[in-house]
Regions:
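Short alpha-helical segment that forms part of, or immediately flanks, the ligand-binding pocket
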Residues: 84, 106-111, 125-126
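Conserved donor-binding/catalytic core segment of Leloir-type glycosyltransferases
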Residues: 16, 20, 24-50, 56
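A short, active-site helix/loop in glycosyltransferases that binds the activated sugar's phosphate group
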Residues: 1-13, 57
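A conserved nucleotide-sugar
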Residues: 38, 56-84
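A charged, aromatic-enriched C-terminal amphipathic alpha-helix characteristic of glycosyltransferases
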Residues: 158-189
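Acidic donor-binding loop of glycosyltransferase active sites
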Residues: 88-101, 114
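Short hydrophobic beta-strand element within catalytic cores of glycosyltransferases
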Residues: 115-122
Length: 191
């Protein structure tokens, strides 16, 4: 929304990241997995909005080709608490194909040290003035691009520890709920 409103209401808009309460998250930098565990959560009523209807068949194709190197944890319509538990063993989470930025689910995954495949466009980093951290494996809404990015992480799973550590650092740096609350208060006081 920021990108849409900023040109017209520049004095009334500010980009403030989504908050994550890091006290409620157990972070763990992932090691190089023997078998890469992909996690995809599917809400049947929203699959086409989140892009999981496009990502899942591509992920299944990668799993078929590299069954000795990866597995898939596929979760359908579970309560949020159960979703979080099932995500704990993941190395890589797929979410929000059409987004420019990570979703709340992706941020939660990143806070846990899970690498995210999804919305991580250059604009996401530019709006934060982030020039070094690049924890998100950005994918385009294109089956070939998704396949190439998934295949690449399967064949180069040695990247997982670095991406995992960057994910934790990214969320702590930009999405800590206390820092986000301060940004809201600062903006409110100025206006």
């Amino acid at each position: 929304y920021y990108a849409s409103y900023q040109p017209y209401f520049s004095d009334k808009t500010a980009f403030i990241p989504l908050p994550i309460d890091l006290r409620e998250v157990t972070s763990r930098v992932r090691s190089v997995p023997e078998k890469l565990n992909f996690f995809i959560g599917i809400q049947s009523a929203r699959s086409n909005l989140k892009g999981t209807d496009v990502m899942l068949p591509v992920l299944q194709e990668v799993r078929r080709k590299y069954s000795e190197l990866c597995r898939v944890t596929e979760v359908h319509d579970v309560p949020y608490a159960r979703y979080q538990q099932l995500m704990d063993d993941a190395d890589v989470q797929l979410d929000q194909l059409y987004s420019y930025t990570p979703s709340m689910n992706s941020l939660l995954a990143m806070a846990k040290g899970v690498t995210v495949v999804g919305g991580g466009e250059p604009e996401n980093y530019e709006i934060l003035n982030e020039t070094e951290l690049r924890p998100i494996i950005n994918v385009l809404p294109d089956e070939q691009d998704i396949y190439q990015k998934l295949e690449d992480i399967v064949l180069h799973k040695e990247r997982i520890p670095e991406l995992s550590a960057q994910s934790i650092e990214y969320v702590a740096k930009y999405h800590d709920h206390v820092k986000v609350a301060r940004q809201y208060l600062d903006f409110w006081k100025k206006h």
